[in-house]
């Protein structure tokens, strides 16, 4: 995430980036499944389940920023950076979970099982 922007901006961006990656990836993947002759709603549900971790990684800006923040927090005693990074990860997890829930509501795939 951008270090110059305020923390709340990064917090909100993290949520919506994860939400967008999950919903967008699942819907575009469902379109691809439809064009390939496969059931699109089933494909959307499966993709949403598989994209949760990638939405999280995309939202926090890759793994190196997170590792660097944890390293700085542990080695330099700057616990504020660790706390901020944990909050960003929780925000991204919330966005990914919200996206998965929206996809689940749209597809209603869990009802057909």
Swiss-Prot record:
Induction: Transcriptionally regulated by sigma-E. GO terms for cellular component: membrane. The chain crosses the membrane at residues 16-36, 51-71, 86-106. It is a multi-pass membrane protein. Disulfide bonds: none annotated. It is found in: Forespore outer membrane. Disruption phenotype: Impaired ability to form spores when associated with a ytrI deletion. In combination with a ybaN deletion, cells show a severe sporulation defect. Signal peptide: none annotated. Keywords: Membrane, Sporulation, Transmembrane, Transmembrane helix. InterPro entries: Spore_YtrH. GO terms for biological process: sporulation resulting in formation of a cellular spore. Involved in sporulation. May contribute to cortex formation or stability. This is Sporulation membrane protein YtrH. The gene is ytrH.
């Amino acid at each position: 995430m951008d270090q110059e922007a305020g923390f709340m901006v990064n917090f909100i961006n993290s949520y919506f980036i994860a939400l967008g990656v999950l919903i967008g990836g699942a819907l575009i993947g469902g379109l691809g499944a439809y064009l390939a002759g496969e059931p699109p709603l089933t494909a959307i549900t499966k993709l949403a389940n598989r994209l949760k971790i990638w939405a999280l990684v995309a939202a926090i800006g890759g793994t190196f920023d997170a590792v660097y923040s944890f390293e700085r927090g542990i080695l330099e005693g700057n616990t504020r950076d660790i706390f901020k990074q944990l909050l960003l990860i929780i925000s991204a997890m919330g966005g990914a979970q919200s996206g998965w829930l929206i996809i689940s509501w749209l597809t209603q795939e869990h009802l057909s099982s």
